[in-house]
């Protein structure tokens, strides 16, 4: 007797699976696009002198996240290293407006700083409450596998985006003044990454 033919039943067609996959990434991009309005480019500027005794500007750039507005100034969380030795700090918004900022506080243990832009320097569109980033909580025990989106400069370029997921939680970082619970992701970065 000849063997019975193998019948393969297709569950859903491939094009709809590809379309669903593409739609998922479109939705992730839309979330990142909307969230990027809460990010700014922070430029730390300092003057240096070259070997020929000529003065030149040295600029470092990173991403900042609008985290609050106290009614007097807008507060932005950013990378401390980029502004550490800066003689002036500039903040550039999504609409290309660039204004001066001042350092409010720094934490060398975490590598973070808070800078401030005076409200009177900003048009009303940049004072909108919707620009303040909505921060989540890491207290949940079921964070493993949750999708994450890195915005800012995760690949070292301004306005780059990277997608991944939380891969571990629970490792502790013990520093002088505090203990921090670390979460890791499968996002990769490079030495120029911030965001």
Predicted segments, located by residue:
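Gly/Ser-enriched beta-turn/beta-hairpin loop segments
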Residues: 50-59, 105-110, 116-121, 169-183
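N-terminal activation segment of mature serine protease catalytic domains
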Residues: 2-66, 75-76, 88, 143, ...
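Short beta-turn/strand-loop junction motif enriched in small, turn-promoting residues
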Residues: 45-49, 151-155, 171-172
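Short beta-strand segments
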Residues: 58-62, 97-99, 123, 162, ...
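Short beta-strand-centered aromatic/proline hotspots
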Residues: 102, 162-168
């Amino acid at each position: 007797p000849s063997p019975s033919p193998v019948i393969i039943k297709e569950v859903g067609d491939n094009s709809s699976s590809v379309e669903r996959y593409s739609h998922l990434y479109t939705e992730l991009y839309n979330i990142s696009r909307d969230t990027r309005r809460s990010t700014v480019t922070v430029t730390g500027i300092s003057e240096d002198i070259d070997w020929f005794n000529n003065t030149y500007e040295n600029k470092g750039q990173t991403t900042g996240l609008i985290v609050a507005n106290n009614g007097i100034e807008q507060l932005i969380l950013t990378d401390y290293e980029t502004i550490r030795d800066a003689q002036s700090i500039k903040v550039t918004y999504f609409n290309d407006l660039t204004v001066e900022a001042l350092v409010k506080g720094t934490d060398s243990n975490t590598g973070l700083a808070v800078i401030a832009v005076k409200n009177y320097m900003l048009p009303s569109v940049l004072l909108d409450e919707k620009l303040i980033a909505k921060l989540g909580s890491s207290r949940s025990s079921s964070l493993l596998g949750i999708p994450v989106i890195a915005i800012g400069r995760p690949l070292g370029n301004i306005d780059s985006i990277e997608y991944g997921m939380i891969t571990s939680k629970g490792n502790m970082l013990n520093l002088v003044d505090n203990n921090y619970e670390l979460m890791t992701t499968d996002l990769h970065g490079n030495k120029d990454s911030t965001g």
